[in-house]
UniProtKB/Swiss-Prot annotation:
This is Glutamine--tRNA ligase. It comes from Haemophilus influenzae (strain 86-028NP). GO terms for cellular component: cytosol. A motif ('KMSKS' region) lies at residues 277-281. InterPro entries: aa-tRNA-synth_I_CS, Gln-tRNA-synth, Gln/Glu-tRNA_Ligase, Gln_tRNA_ligase_bac, Glu/Gln-tRNA-synth, Glu/Gln-tRNA-synth_Ib_cat-dom, Glu/Gln-tRNA-synth_Ib_codon-bd, Glu_tRNA_lig_a-bdl. GO terms for molecular function: ATP binding; glutamine-tRNA ligase activity. ATP binds at E43, P44, N45, H49, I50, G51, H52, A53, K54, S55, T239, R270, L271. The keyword Kinase does not apply.
Amino acid sequence: MMSHTETSLGAENTRTHNFITQIIDEDLASGKHKSVHTRFPPEPNGYLHIGHAKSICLNFGLAKEYQGLCNLRFDDTNPVKEDVEYVDSIKADVEWLGFKWEGEPRYASDYFDALYGYAAELIKKGLAYVDELSPDEMREYRGTLTEPGKNSPYRDRTIEENLALFEKMKNGEFAEGKASLRAKIDMASPFMVMRDPVIYRIKFASHHQTGDKWCIYPMYDFTHCISDAIERITHSICTLEFQDNRRLYDWVLENISIERPLPHQYEFSRLNLEGTLTSKRKLLKLVNDEIVDGWNDPRMPTISGLRRRGYTPASLREFCRRIGVTKQDNVVEYSALEACIREDLNENAPRAMAVIDPVRVVIENFESEAVLTAPNHPNRPELGERQLPFTKELYIDRADFREEANKQYKRLVLGKEVRLRNAYVIKAERVEKDANGEITTIFCTYDPETLGKNPADGRKVKGVIHWVSAVNNHPAEFRLYDRLFTVPNPGAEDDIESVLNPNSLVIKQGFVEQSLANAEAEKGYQFEREGYFCADSKDSRPEHLVFNLTVSLKEGF
């Protein structure tokens, strides 16, 4: 049964059509595969970002659509950059997005023994050799896009010698950088990836899964295809930058003794989102330099950052559905992402009132205290109502009052009337100012006959503003987030700090209505006339409420 969110956001459960589903349809129809088995294979060297959300939705979505399976596999072949913290965060992100992997999470490191055996098989077939060129020498020998490479002087070692040297590498008898295992393919290939790529290198580093068992680690290109084959993946889907690597993917599998049919790799365009950065290296620098508040800072493009900001799983899934799957690289406008969360929250978020830049209002002819009611959602009666204490002293937003204004200003003006949302019509009679000329109090009168109805004498009151009781409220901190960068493509900048938006976070102190005392972390609210907000999952608590701006009420604000 679909949730209300899924219904409102569109066709999450409808059939998708793209070049990958076309391939799968043909494979199933021809009998090449009887079922579909995909995988999502992140390297645990950072937190997942919005680009990974596209890959997650694609791989898990295909498995769901074709009633198949999808594995979560950690491509953990570089112990220097990886950490169990990233493993845990990736699992949490995938589950939060609404997906469940087949069985237990897999690790490429589960296959280290098998991978070592396949590497030895390539040596025995004369298809791999131990090279002792230094990394600099190897670069020099590799050639360029316009010049062929040169064979290493170690390329023609005997099979016996290579097996013995590979064993020595495994036993820690070479220092780091002094030896590597390379596939023997073609140093004159027009494809750089096929010029005798390194398939094993030495790293004396403890691994988060295997400890100190290994001091040699397989390279991604060697590991990935074999892991797919071991797990019987039918369709190995990755982004376009791995297109040339497919040649190596196929070469490795075709030259080892592994169960057929072999998996095949398909590439789609990665997500390029306007104004965001997805380089893990550059994101890590932002974290390490404390430019942001960790990987889950609400300005970060990470899934955990978007979650903390107030994005919902349904909104991210819908965004990925709308941008689709193609082979063409393009840049998606950030407003397309914002539209998805805005639609979701407009449909599902309860309403509340918050005054972010408060100024005091005193209603001089109101002496008692009333408890009014207001719907939690104008179109969703099943979400119920809330109580609004109405008192002699209130707060309104400073921007909602002027001493003088033209007719276009439909808020409170000295000597004129405005309606308070879900309450009465009030009239501004006079103001009190401090020594600097700043308004400290607006003195008003109210019309007691205007609760839920227009003035009896037929006079028109056009404006409506929000308010909070100055007595029954909760102080709150409001974090008004904006884009982290001032340019559309921050990834192209050498110095990303030079394009940081100095106003990406503005903090205000104000008040929220009483009903938000126990606001649930990450739950979205529409603060009427202000925007969509959620309680911060890290810092908000009942005695110190903190609300993050998720998105404005309308595009362009």
